[in-house]
Each structure stands twice: as structure tokens, then as C-alpha cells.
Amino acid sequence: MLKSLSKLTPSIRGVVSINRSFCTKKFLPTNRSVSESDPEIYDLMMKEKQRQFTGLELIASENFTSRAVMESIGSCFTNKYAEGLPGARYYGGNEVVDQLENLCIKRALETFNLNPEEWGVNVQPYSGSTANFAAFTGLLKPHDRIMGLDLPSGGHLTHGYQTDKKKISATSIFFESMPYQVNETGYVDYNKMEANAALFRPKLLIAGASAYPREWDYERMRKIADKHGAYLLCDMAHISGMVAGKQAISPFLFCDVVTTTTHKTLRGPRAGLIFFRKTKRRDAKGNIIDDDLENRINFAVFPSCQGGPHENTIAGIAVALKEASSPDFQEYTKQVRRNSQTMGEELKKRGYSLVTEGTDNHLVLWDLRPQGITGSKIEKACDEAHITVNKNAVYGDTNAIAPGGVRLGAPALTSRGLKEQDFVKVVDFLDRVVKISLDIQSKVGKKMPDFQRAIADNQDLKQIRQEVKEFSTKFGMPGEL
């Protein structure tokens, strides 16, 4: 901070100096660090940093962002209200914010090689979930019909998830939802999707998932959507970084709208983006339709679903997008894919089963049902070893609390510099955790409370924890402040 102040003009330095003195009054915000002003929160920050540094982060939706992104999130942009769009705000004083948001829009389109005459983007959504609901709000009327991948098949809650007894997602509450599913191979069943769409006649067909390790057939989904005059939306939250790095098929070739988070494989802050096609489309009879998606999506974000955008987060998004446009980022996504495939192959070598028998992207879905243990138990046992994973449903599961699978992702550890040979070691740790867990289960039975009590004092898991710490701390922690 002091170094940056030295570069300011004399007049600005004087203002800053005055403000520093001014803020010594007790009722005003201070310039003290969090370690001085709130030791309790600072202590938690240090504990979390230690947890991330000494452990192995394998959750597919997590990543390490850069220091530049973190600095942007903590910048003075957090002070500014900016309801509306650039050039059309409901508050004054947004001349700099307008420049920021326009730059973020420009970078978002450039990162995904989009022509600004054909595509636009709203950079204001607070998260991926709000981006999705705003997109649905802009595209649909209440109780219109949607089809998305079922949650137990690897879909996301926001794609219309509901159970036999209850509508879970707001999407399923305000719209009529009929999911499509994977088949017994773990691949999306496009034939059944097409047959069900002919009966259900959706207004919106959604591609995208939170736990699907394979590429999407956007072209076929486009044809299915066109048969029923439906929009095709891709939620590329998990793979947006892979798309930017040219390691996944681009959904922009076939979709009307594309949503994403910015913090997963894209390595930005926690937020969302909505891309929309500006060009006109044709219906099944060849008639030109002007959907005006730009105004519909923008109005859905504000004022329909949100108030003022978080401009400090938008600054972080802009920084992350610049990073994602670099050759280094393309190399990163290539390494993510190699590491993910290595992880899958090493698990198979040790006799484990994978959904679809492999992966095309950043994650693998590990099926532990042949071993006779649940993903929820392995998640808890991994926690004891300081390996962070998440339980996940696999095809045929009926219990979301105790599913048969575990989702593993390579993005975070790849950001720390791990390569293929390092992921062989990671799989060794995972294999040992499973074997220890099976031994514990054989002794205490299958009830989760008994299992959790047994792993809490297990010396073998404590030994792995120490080895994990020694291994993990050999690698840096990006974004350290």
C-alpha cells in the first residue's frame, strides 16, 4: 500500500494523508489491518490458509485465485453503488465504474473469441445460481417447461431439481421441470432426451452439469431444441476455463445463451456471467425471430433479480479474464486435463471403477459401490487425512446423503503446480484412505456415527495426514497475501 501511494500525484498523496489522519477518530473507518482491528477473524483467516496450504484440495468446483484478483476484490470499488448498466445508471459518480464494467465485458467476449456484433454478456450476476435464474427469468414465462440434467445424473440444483415429494430448486417452483438422465454407461442418454422432449415440448433445454466427466453433444441438443422452438442454454460453470483454454468444445457454436461461474476452472472471484446471442434466429419453418435477448437478459439481471452490482467483484472478474486470455492459462488447462486423466487411470490401475470409465475434462467421478462403501464415508475419512473431496451421486443412487460416489477434480492442485507424477502420489493417498476405511467399517459396522467415531482417533489416518502435509507444503499457494 505504501509503495503504491508513492506513485500518486502530490495532490492525491495529500488527500490520502489527510484521510489517514482523519480516520483516527473513533467513529470513522480505520486504516488498520484486519489483524489489528479484528484478531478473531484474522485468526480464522490464518487457520483457513493453513488448511488449504497443508492439505490437498480435490473438490472439482474449487480453485486458487491470483493475488491480483484478491487485491481487486478488496479495492475501493467495493464502496460504490452502480445500479443499472454502463451509461444508464441510477446513481451518479459512476464514470470510472462504467469504464471498469465495459472493460470487463470486452475481456469476457475476447476470452471466448466472441464477435461483439453477434454476442453480448452481462457481467453483474452475483453467482452462478443467480446467473442461471436471471437467464431463466429473461427467457421464460412462469410455468414454462424446462429440461435439464437430473441431479443424481450429475446435474445442478438450479437446472430444475425436484423430488417425488418436493420441489427443491426455485427453478422447479416457478417453472415446470422434466429432467433428462444418463444411462447405465454414465453417458447422457440423448435418445431418451429426444423422445421425452417430443412429449414434454420444453421451452428451454439446458446443457451443462456439476459432475459429468464427458463432452456434450451441443449439435444434437440444438436439433432437439429446434424441433420444439426451444432455447438452448449451456451452463458451463465447471468447464468455462477449459473452454477458454481450448480444452473443451465451445458451447457458443450452438447455444442461444451461455452462463458460467467465474471461480472454478476460470480461477476468478466468486461470481457469474451470462452470455447472450445478439443475432436473430429462425423457427422450425424458417421464419426469422428477433428474440431481443440482450434487453431481456439485462432486464432480468437488473431490476428483476438483483440490485446494485458488486463492482469490486467485477474488477476481479476483469483481472481473471485477462489472465485466462494468456498462453500460460492455456498451458494450465492442458495440464488440468492431463492431471485429471492421470488421476482416473491410476484409480483404475488400483481396481477402482469410474463413471464412463474416464474423463474428458477436469474431473473424475469415482464409483465406490463395488467396494461396498459410501462416498459420504470416504469424504469424512479423507477429511481426517486433510484431503478434501466431496461425496457425489452416481447412476442408480437413491440416497443423496449417502451416495455411492466421490467427485475428484484437478484444477486446484494444478494451480499449485502439481503434474502427472504428483497425481500418482495423490491417488496413492486416496487408495490408502479407502483401504483403512474398509477395515474400520468391517470392525464397527455400516452406521455412519460409529464410523465417524472410529476414524477420529485412527492412527493410520493421522499418519497419512502427516505425509499429506509434508507432500503438500512442497508446493506454493497462489494468491497469498
Curated annotation (Swiss-Prot):
Q: Is Ubl conjugation set as a keyword in this record?
A: no
Please give the subunit comment from the record: Homotetramer.
Report the protein name in the record: Serine hydroxymethyltransferase 2
Q: In which pathway does it act?
A: One-carbon metabolism; tetrahydrofolate interconversion
Cofactor(s) demanded: pyridoxal 5'-phosphate
The top EC class, named as a word, is: transferase
Its Enzyme Commission number? 2.1.2.1
- Keywords annotated in UniProt: One-carbon metabolism, Pyridoxal phosphate, Transferase
Q: What are the GO BP annotations of this UniProt entry? A: glycine biosynthetic process from serine; one-carbon metabolic process; tetrahydrofolate interconversion; tetrahydrofolate metabolic process
- Similarity remark: Belongs to the SHMT family.
The reactions it catalyses are:
(6R)-5,10-methylene-5,6,7,8-tetrahydrofolate + glycine + H2O = (6S)-5,6,7,8-tetrahydrofolate + L-serine
Looking at the UniProt record for this protein, which Gene Ontology cellular component terms does it annotate, in alphabetical order? cytoplasm; mitochondrial matrix; mitochondrion
Task: Give any GO molecular function from the UniProt entry.
Answer: pyridoxal phosphate binding
- Residues recorded as bearing N6-(pyridoxal phosphate)lysine in the entry: K264
* PANTHER family xrefs: SERINE HYDROXYMETHYLTRANSFERASE, SERINE HYDROXYMETHYLTRANSFERASE 2
Entry's SUPFAM superfamilies?
PLP-dependent transferases
Functional description taken from the UniProt entry? Interconversion of serine and glycine.
